[in-house]
Design a protein with these regions (language model features):
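Helix-loop boundary and gating motifs at the non-cytosolic
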Residues: 2-67, 71
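Helix-loop junctions at membrane interfaces in 12-TM secondary transporters
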Residues: 15-17, 98-112, 168
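C-terminal membrane-cytosol helix-exit motif in multi-pass small-molecule transporters
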Residues: 180-199
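Transmembrane alpha-helix termini and helix-breaking/packing motifs in multi-pass membrane transporters
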Residues: 39-45, 72-77, 100, 151-176
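C-terminal ends and interior cores of transmembrane alpha-helices
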Residues: 87-104, 163-166
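Intracellular juxtamembrane helix-capping segments at the cytosolic ends
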Residues: 120-134
Length: 200
């Protein structure tokens, strides 16, 4: 069953690395979309107020502030961590999709903020998966390789998104829909990674 650890340790590590590679590829594009689109659209398309711009800029930090409380709550759920990560990404995807229909800066910012706060909970949960699924002598190599791929894919995506938005700012709606699809892809690959529940 997806989300549960049932393989031998060697199989767990291999399966984790393979699906985490695909997860990081999708996630790199999603993160680049956040970084390249949100503030630019808020400023240039919606002519957002300073308050809205500040909230968007601090979305990730707001998410990190509530991470300890979030971990405490989900530790009681007894769900495998990969399933929780998948649920978070599906909810973030829906919020991003809704943002494509935004007609005001506050509505747009609210959707993006919710998506950002949900998405930034995932890295702390992935630490649990990496700790359980990789041996200590291979953990750094396997994690860093996938993160490097995410960074490379993300930088290329950010450049392409910048060109698109310079061409026509209204393309942010298409970008949001594409990001929605990639968030769902990230959620799917989370489900394929073996994991155990958090201990409260």
């Amino acid at each position: 069953m997806s989300g549960e650890t049932k393989d031998y340790p060697e199989g767990i590590a291999s399966k984790t690395q393979n699906f985490d590679l695909w997860r990081n590829t999708c996630n790199g594009i999603v993160e680049a979309s956040f970084a390249s689109t949100c503030l630019l659209v808020a400023i240039r398309y919606f002519e957002a107020s300073d308050t809205v711009k500040s909230l968007l800029a601090g979305g990730g930090s707001i998410g990190f502030l509530i991470t300890p409380l979030f971990l405490l709550l989900i530790g009681r759920s007894k769900l495998p961590v990969s399933i929780i990560c998948s649920i978070l990404m599906v909810c973030a995807a829906i919020s991003i999709l809704i943002s494509a229909s935004a007609t005001t800066s506050w509505f747009y910012a609210s959707c993006v903020l919710i998506a950002c706060i949900l998405a930034v909970q995932v890295p702390s949960l992935m630490v649990h998966i990496y700790s359980n699924n990789y041996n200590s002598n291979e953990r750094g190599r396997k994690i860093s390789g996938n993160l490097m791929l995410s960074a490379i894919v993300g930088s290329i995506t950010a450049l392409l998104i910048g060109f698109l938005l310079d061409e026509k700012l209204n393309y942010f709606r298409i970008i949001a829909i594409a990001t929605f699809v990639l968030c769902l892809g990230t959620a799917y690959f989370h489900l394929k990674i073996p994991s155990t529940p958090l201990k409260a």
